[in-house]
Amino acid sequence: MKLTKKRIVLACVAAAAAGVAVSAIASSPATELTPVPSANTKSAGYAPASVLSRELEQIAVAQGSTRLENPSAAVAYYGYDNDVLGPGGQPVMVPTPATPVEAQKTEPDKNTYLVFKNGLSGGTPGANYGTRFLFQGHEAGSPGYITRINLDADGAHRVTLLATSDKNGNPLPVFDGSTWEPWAQRLLFTAERGNAGGVWAATLDVPSVVEDVSGALGRGGYEGIQDDSDGNIWIVEDVGGSNKPGTTARRPNSFVFRYVPAKPGDLHNGKLQALQVLRAGTPITFESQAPLASPDQVALHTYGTSFPTRWVTVHDTATDGNAPFDANALAKAKQATPFKRPENGVFRPNSKFEEFVFTETGDTNATSPENDCCGGWTAVLRLEQSSPSADTGTLSLVYKGNQAHAGFDNLSFLSKDLLAVVEDAGDTLHTQRNALDSGFVLDVTADYSNPANEPLRWLAEGRDPSATIDAGNGGFGKNDQDNEITGIHVSDGDPTTNGILGTKTPHPWEPSGQWRVFYTQQHGDNPTYEVVRPEK
């Protein structure tokens, strides 16, 4: 029997419940995955290994203790600052009785994979760095910095430090998101720092020339960042709102933005717009979502409903100039619609950039009274437009989470319909539900209002010993604790405009090997993994 997408989801759920392997359920290796039946549990001193679908394996391409080929005085390793040194002059990566402290972990974050047929230069003249590269910013420490994993290089040249300061000598902020802007020929990095955050553009050079472009793209708690085929840049914000009185439910406080450049590749002149959602002809706003379980929030998170949208311009360099500005405050003033920490978004492949899917991470607390009604557990939403530059569209709910599927953060398409999403549920929710983070596959064509349809777990993340030590010692006052999953990234590395994510249908784990899958197990040892399908 030929399996439809709905049947694929149902088959996976039924097999998971019965403990039966799911294999050969469709022609693409992305769908030939055995579900991992449950998440790893959490308890003091317990450091379980990660469990992947049996068809998959992961290979560390770098980890926090990988030494940079061109270290600086402040930064010498992929995942550690030089702020606390041991007797041997190296960062204290694991506490000892004699040195019961740790160096600052720098938390490598979102990954961007690129292939350059003629290679790139590095920190060592004459070294062979190959053609395949993985770029990332770092989310913690001081200064912030940018690195490049040279996937084809030897150990001594595996990771290159690109920059710790901008072109004016200012220390870089810590970074979350990243993408490649093919028209500008720049890497773009986002800083999730509220009205001190924004977007920085970096060249491929070593050292990289890095420029703060927040005079056009604004300042905000920016995380997710993607191009579209018209040269617009879509930015998804993560700014946690204040608690609603007397509860652990948090106010929606983060926006989805679209930067429309004067021409593709122009990072200095253009308009920043924010998404506005309307209900019964009235904008859903920061104020309208202030009451507990507000009607607007409930409506947005109800299966089968859809809402008209429009883009409102919050800043135009032609009339407002090029001084950095607070994008979040302007979006509120223009009555744009905030969400519960949307964090990241991607375009559905082969949709002509007419479908944009984004997550809401939610409240990450099992006691939130808005978990079931309002996206407090998590949600996946879909924006549909007639073109990527259209002024209007429609927003609808793809998936509403529950305790076992919560805190969705990063996402990346595995095929036209199958979406990989990963949890960042956080230490509090890990403890409350006795479950660490997982990675799932959602089918964006499935009807998740039917409780028989559930996401397929492809990864039950573990907790490495370093993270377990941090969890038992409060991170030594500086470091994060439980591991989280970040930087899930599926790409063929095409640096041209034809390679913008969403242009082509991904084909990971196929014999051609062009499409590759990466993620980082953030915190603890901070390994960055490539997920592969071993040869049978």
Label each region the model flagged.
Residues 25-536:
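Conserved small-residue
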Residues 4-25:
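Gram-negative bacterial Sec-dependent N-terminal signal peptides
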